[in-house]
Each structure stands twice: as C-alpha cells, then as structure tokens.
Amino acid sequence: MKEYQIHLELDRSQQNNFLYPLLFREYIYALAHDHGLNRSTIPLENGGYDNKSSSLSVKRLISRTYQRIHLSIYAKDSNPNQFIGHNNKFYSQMISEGFSVIVEIPFSLRLVAFLEGKEMAKSQNFQSIHSIFPFFENNFSHLHYVLDVLIPYPIRPEILVRTFRYWVKDASSLHLLRFFLHEYFNWNSLITPKKSNSIFSTRNPRFFLFLYNSHVYEYESIFFFLRNQSSHLRSTSSGLLFERISFYGKVEDLVQVFVNDFQDNLWLFKHPIMHYVRYQGKSVLASKDMPLLMNKWKYYLVNLWQWHFHVWSQPGRIHINHLYKDYIDFLGYLSRGRLNTLVVRSQMLENAFLIDNAMKQFETTVPIIPLIGSLTTARFCNSLGHPISKPTWADSSDSYIIDRFMRICRNLSHYHSGSSKKKSLYRIKYILRVSCVKSLVRKHKSTVRVFLKRLGSEFLEEFFTEEEHVLSLIFPRALFTSRRLYRGRVWYLDIICINDLVNHDKLEIVPN
C-alpha cells in the first residue's frame, strides 16, 4: 500500500475569451474562414444538427441581435429585461446558439493540431461506437469484475458555471452562461429529451451538450489521474467526449482540470489491469481485482462526485458485477463472459486422458424485453409483444409505409448485427413485418389473408433477407461467406450513434 497526497492545481494556459467574438462580430467571420478549421477532419458545422448553428448563420443572427438592441434603446417604453426574457425567447436562443458555436472553436483547433501532430489517418472508423465491442472481446474476456456506473449530473446550474470557469478568462462569459442556465435551465432535458418541453431540448441541444462535455471531461480527468496513480503502467488514455460534438482528443496532461477538494489522503493499491469505457451517461470499469478493490473504486467515485461536484450519488447508480455471472447493459447490448468447455483426448503410451479446457469468450445478445418496450412506446406492438397497426401512417402511400418499416427493420438489423444469438432479432423483425401488414390492411379496409395474397410472398421475405443481401454485395464472389457472416457476429464501423429504439437507457436515467 502506498499513500499519495493529492495536490491538483488548475492550469489556466488553456483558457479562452469566449464572449469577445460575440461583441466583435468580424472575429467570428474570420474564424469561419480559418485555414485550420477548413483542414479539420471534423467540421465546425456538425452533421448532427441543423444548419442554423453554422458560424455564418450565427453571424447574421448576431447582426440582427444588434439591431434589436438599438431598437430597444431608442424605444420609449423599452424594458431592459425585455430583450432577452420570457417575452422574447427567440433572441435568447440566437445568442445561445452563437455562444455554443464559439466555445467549440478552441476545441476544434486543438483537434486539428492533435491530428496533425500524431499524423492520424482520416478514417470514420475512429468515430464508430461499434468499435467498443471488439475492444471488449479482446480485453474483457480474461477479467473478472465490472463496475457498471451511471454518471450523475448536477441539478443546480451554479455547478455547471463552476465547472465551465476553468475554460474561460472573461467573467462576462460566465455571467452570460449563468443567465442562460437560470433563465431556461432544465438539465433533465439533456438526458431525457422526449419527456421535456424545454426550449433547449427542442431548439438548442448543442448548448447543453457542450456543458455536459465540460462536466464529464473534468470528472474523467480526475478519474484518469487516480487510475494512473494506482497502475503499474502509466499509460496514455484516449478520451472521446459526448456523441458527435466534434470533441476528440488525447488526455495526456491529466492535471489541467483539477481541484483541491479532497480533504483526506487517498490510499491506493497497485492495480495491474484496468479498462474504462463510456458512452453518454453510462460507463464501464473492468478489472481483474477482487471485489474488495472494486468496492474501493466505488467508494472513491462516490466521494469524488460528492466532494468535488457536490452531487449526491445514490448507491444504486454503481453496481459491481461478475463478468461471467451478470450481464452488462451497454449500448443496447447485453454482454458477458462465457466459459466454453472443450474436451481434448490425450494419448500417452498406453494411457489415455480426457482434458477439459475452458475457453473464455465474450458474447453479446439483444435485450429483447427493453427492445419490445421501445416498440410498444413507438406503437408497433402492445406490451405483450403482439404486433399492432400504425394508424398515424394511414394517410401515407403504400410505398411510403413499406419503406418506413423496411428502413426501421434494416437499421435495427444493422445495429444488432453483432449479436451472438439471432433469434431475438428475428422476433423483432416479425413484429415489424406484421405491424406493416396490419397498417396496410387498416388503410385499405381489408383482411390480412386477402392482402397478403394480393401482395405476394416476396414481401414477407424482404424483412429477413435484407441484411444477407447487403453482405452478399460486400462479398459478391462468396455467397457461403456472406451467409455465414449473417448468421455470425458482424461489427459495422460506420455506426457513430446509438439507435433511437435501442436507446432505452435514456428512459431509465432520473435526476438524483
């Protein structure tokens, strides 16, 4: 056992003046044509959002905002609080969008410098979330215990302002941020956007996602510091921030965003192996250690959240699971280790021996019950899994209805192609197929038997052969290979976000 006295200081060399581009409008126009940003492999205008958040559009919005300010000044009955408030949320949204774009610019420039320094290949596979599962297969099969962690998030706006102050120089940016948070704050909308009517949940999620990035980045930086202090090998860790917000980087200087809020000394054991993976608000910490040491890490995480982030973490947010007994619910898959016994007959002179070899594998399956719950919420089936019609699509054309169902079925098959057992996936396809037929029958006021007889049996086969057809295009000269891959596990490295129907974890995260 070795004692470490932690003294972490803030490195302010990375701070920026974020509000000045809003005050001096030409600066943001120059940034839009910056040569470094144009070379970036991940553009400033992120593809996951609409074009309203582009830098040039924000420049126009800021110009209109200045005109609004002059009109408010010269108006006789002008109210200083009327410019941005409940009576005029549009201009508040305009400024928040501009603020969101500007605060992402320094991180985009860091990304350009990082990619050029490392000479990293420009590949979309770098963004794929399915690349996590090959990592599980290669590194988790020989481990024993896993910490299944739901990262808590602050429910008070001032905590976010406190976190964000490490990135800024000008106090005016903090005041503007504090105004946005106190005026329209609804942190629950970030995790459960479907249940919230907040203006940011429907019109400007980019602003809150950046704040969530800042919050999680600070937590992970401190966690990586503790991990490196307790590891034999001080490895460099790669960090990927929340979804597709143009934030990729290398966590090398792990003392940039730290504080001195620990009141006790940390007693750390030497850990030979530890792996950490996170997506959105859920993370997995795997180790070969005994449950006692995993409980130690659970204790450290809870104290980190409470002492530094002032967030009360319920004990149920961290579970210690045995990798070969319990499942890991992560990215829409149920994953766990599996021991396969292989009997080998050994002959030595006149004696024969039967040797049992335990082969460790990492299997991934489709969580059928949560997925049926998502289909029930989307009105494709009832709570028992029986297919029902989709009345909201009754006014659409037949080709549109069939195309919508085929697209949903194809996306689910594509996302769950890495499942070890295809039986659950076949059941989901069956629900979507019958729901499509019932929707068409309801539209034409006919019966299922008559409609299928008129439509033909080819329609029923398309739902099951679509993925195999895609693999046959990839391997056109090896039909047997494509069929074998279809029955086996295939990880597609073009998937960069979780499927909406698969993302049932969102509905389970609640504030502390």
UniProtKB/Swiss-Prot annotation:
One annotated GO biological process: tRNA processing
Subcellular location: Plastid, Chloroplast
Alphabetized Pfam families for the sequence: Intron_maturas2, MatK_N
Cellular component terms (Gene Ontology): chloroplast
InterPro entries for the chain: Domain_X (IPR024937), Maturase_MatK (IPR002866), Maturase_MatK_N (IPR024942)
Main location: plastid
GO molecular function: RNA binding
Keywords: Chloroplast, mRNA processing, Plastid, RNA-binding, tRNA processing
Top-rank taxon, per record: Eukaryota
The protein's role, per its UniProt record: Usually encoded in the trnK tRNA gene intron. Probably assists in splicing its own and other chloroplast group II introns.
The family this protein is said to belong to: Belongs to the intron maturase 2 family. MatK subfamily.
HAMAP family: MatK
Protein name, entry field: Maturase K
Origin species: Acer campestre (Field maple)
